Amino acid sequence: MVQVNENYLKLKAGYLFPEIAKRVKLYSQSNKNAEIIKLGIGDVTEPLPRACIEAMGKALDDMGTTDGFRGYGPEQGYAWLREKISEHDFISRGCQISPEEIFVSDGSKCDSSNILDILGKDNSIAVTDPVYPVYVDSNVMTGRTGDALENGTYQGLTYLAINEANNFLPELPEKKVDILYLCFPNNPTGATINKEELKKWVDYALQNKSLILFDAAYEAFIQDNDIPHSIYEIEGAKDCAIEFRSFSKNAGFTGVRCAFTVIPKNLKGLSSTNEEIELWPLWNRRQSTKFNGVSYVVQKGAEAVYSLEGKKQVRGLIDFYMENAKIMKNKLQNSGYKVYGGDNAPYIWIKVPDQMTSWDFFDFLLQKVSVVGTPGSGFGLAGEGYFRLSAFNSRSNVIDAMERIINI
């Protein structure tokens, strides 16, 4: 009989969001008339930008002609999209990222997991706590951790707590760590980091020859001018960081699927014989072998994000969701809740009432007012006592949900 990858057996009972779905399903089955409002998973609700729809429609028409048909595309992504990304997302902010250093993909979730394919298994790893679960689970699946402990953490990982005491900004590791996962604006806490603080991480990585895996999936939601949108705004970051970006939240591509990863050409790692190896060729080889590229139609839709009309429409989507976040934060704060995030990110991070755990508060909101959020403990040990609400929903649902919660 075939042997299984036993690393999967080390995973905790269930991925956070399937567990939420299971509880919601049980509740809805016994409360068939309940009007459930879901503010849990960060999935968008508003239609795609018209510029993207028109671009994809034209691309489909192109595919119906002999001259316009496209088969397999380049694994790295079409040059015309990578050029737009380079110009608008990086060069415009003073980051010297070339189109050649950009790899178009079908999701930053995939890339932040798949990047482990080109990194050795003996690297030491640090994650924030709480943390986006994918960073931890992907390391467990590939055998980079020990067993799960009773408190839900894994042997072999370094956890960097983020909480009220440190303004949800992690402290630098006390010892040398090879791989550092950072996500800003942060999921789940909604916290942001300024250039001075981010420079400390870049300096640490350069000093220790560490690699930063920087998730900037929510950079488009930044409102404050002094907050960096890219780690490459920090001098030296091209020598120590890989950045993940996505069209999912800013342009509503969660169901369309398009993202990109930046791997600078001069970024290097070490072989077992201490030979310096460039990471770009390794990732290019990995993608060429395991990935067929994002469809021509989808990439044309992504290109339209950078058109004049596309930019206006994307800005409209971002403003809509951030107004939702503002409404949520104001309503909850005015009713006595301690609330964080929501100013430069589409997530609200709530301190749950005393005597309740995160899952207690989840069940409380579900049973009392049919509102679904995400228990903070699902993001890590330090997330216990907190609760995440997403601003990705209709305006009427957001207002209704807040009225239900504050009137319990």
Swiss-Prot record:
Keywords (A to Z) from UniProt: Aminotransferase, Pyridoxal phosphate, Transferase
GO molecular function: L,L-diaminopimelate aminotransferase activity; pyridoxal phosphate binding
UniProt name for this protein: LL-diaminopimelate aminotransferase
Catalytic function, reaction form: (2S,6S)-2,6-diaminopimelate + 2-oxoglutarate = (S)-2,3,4,5-tetrahydrodipicolinate + L-glutamate + H2O + H(+)
Native source organism of the sequence: Prochlorococcus marinus (strain AS9601)
Top enzyme class: transferase
Cofactors that this protein relies on: pyridoxal 5'-phosphate
A Pfam family annotated for this UniProt entry: Aminotran_1_2
Complex and partners: Homodimer.
N6-(pyridoxal phosphate)lysine, modified sites: 249
GO terms classed as biological process: lysine biosynthetic process via diaminopimelate, diaminopimelate-aminotransferase pathway
Role this protein plays: Involved in the synthesis of meso-diaminopimelate (m-DAP or DL-DAP), required for both lysine and peptidoglycan biosynthesis. Catalyzes the direct conversion of tetrahydrodipicolinate to LL-diaminopimelate.
Family that this chain belongs to: Belongs to the class-I pyridoxal-phosphate-dependent aminotransferase family. LL-diaminopimelate aminotransferase subfamily.
Binding annotation for pyridoxal 5'-phosphate: 72, 108-109, 132, 187, 218, 246-248, 257, 292
Pathway entry: Amino-acid biosynthesis; L-lysine biosynthesis via DAP pathway; LL-2,6-diaminopimelate from (S)-tetrahydrodipicolinate (aminotransferase route): step 1/1
The EC number(s) this enzyme carries: 2.6.1.83
InterPro entries linked to this entry: Aminotransferase_I/II_large, DapL/ALD1, PyrdxlP-dep_Trfase, PyrdxlP-dep_Trfase_major, PyrdxlP-dep_Trfase_small
Residues given in the record as substrate binding sites: 15, 42, 109, 132, 187, 292, 388
